[in-house]
């Protein structure tokens, strides 16, 4: 699977959804990873760290969204990102559907597979 990590653009959000170490683990499991240039800077990870982990660094979020089968984010997609979503694409992030009906509708209209971190549990239900 080709996994993409765009830079977070929501106000005051500096985290990144995937560390270089995590990207390296995904690569070792046979996945390809792309990341938007600068996406890790707010968390202390340079583009070089990602490149050394086998990640392809892309110039724009649009490129990341266009190439990736699965998008990993910290925060839910915001208005500027909604046009990038496409049918069958998996988006793995913190979704807040109850608080944002327009986001729910946009995800349904685009046909994405929306997976929210908040709804994942371990086999022990923890």
Feature roles, as predicted:
Residues 2-110:
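An N-terminal-biased, well-structured beta-alpha scaffold segment characteristic
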Residues 32, 124-125:
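A very general structural signal that marks isolated residues within well-ordered alpha-helical segments
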Residues 109-117:
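Rossmann-fold dehydrogenase core element
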Residues 117-124:
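Conserved small/polar residues in nucleotide/adenosyl-binding loops
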